[in-house]
Amino acid sequence: RQKNSEGNMNEEPINSDISLGGEYELNGNTFEFTINPDFSQVEADQSKININSTTALRFEERRIFFNEGKDFLSSDLSTVYTRSINNPDYAMKVYNRGEKHSYYFLDAEDAQTPIIVPGYQRSYSGLLGKSHANIFSYNYNIEKGQNIGFLATNRDFEEGGNSSLFSLKGNFLFNEIYNTRFELVSTAMDEPISDVINTTNVSKEHTYNLDGESFEGYGGVFGISRDTENWSTRYYFATKSPNYRSDLGFTTENNWKKHSVEHKYKYRSDGFVRKGNVEIRKDLMQDYDGVIIDLSLIHI
């Protein structure tokens, strides 16, 4: 406080916000909620800028509320990025880790909504007003680490419009040495109308501005591997189509396909040379016109 011209101390208004949160467990279900939470410890991240980056920066989730249960939301395509729920007025979630069935549901109202518009090898970002977010995940555990599950997300914007995402994924084992996994994603976008992004750049079919356009996209992952005592062979494919958007996920680039092939020999012995590895891997990334974005060949 400072003194005024009469020598008395100026009285400054006290700003106070009440936060409320809790956690309850019942019959294997965990329920958590937070109202008007104080997440000031993550605000410093918003000021970090990399002038050499043409895409939005990804920050680690450090908020305990969102970290608990995040394994339900794992995805090779980053279909859920909880930092996209930036400044919630409230958030609640319920989840259950059953032996066979597991599920997770989150509902949140965001006061300030970050949005990332992905493009070809770059992205555009801005901060919108309020939005309402829902996330639901279900997983069925089979045996020996095998599982199948699905995920759905939805976000409604105060400015109008909404975005949704649906995914199906699974992991399976065959003959003890073959493993395959997949993830199929469908996205739909009805853009809000806002001037928080202003660029003259466009894609083949749409602008990058938020001008009320509607479109759908898709993404996918497929991997297969064979592992024996000495040999390991893997193939991996991932893609995001030119119209892929995941507003509750983290997507800074679309219009790409990636292939990766790896072959490894593992040497193990009780002799003088106990172990060693020989590996060769080739990675190829292309856009949907067949143009090579990246190509690498690695020998180890």
Model features per residue range: what roles?
Residues 2-3, 26-28, 37-41, 98-100, ...:
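Transmembrane beta-strands of outer-membrane beta-barrel pores
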Residues 2-4, 70-75, 115-118, 144-152, ...:
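Flexible, solvent-exposed coil segments and beta strand-coil junctions
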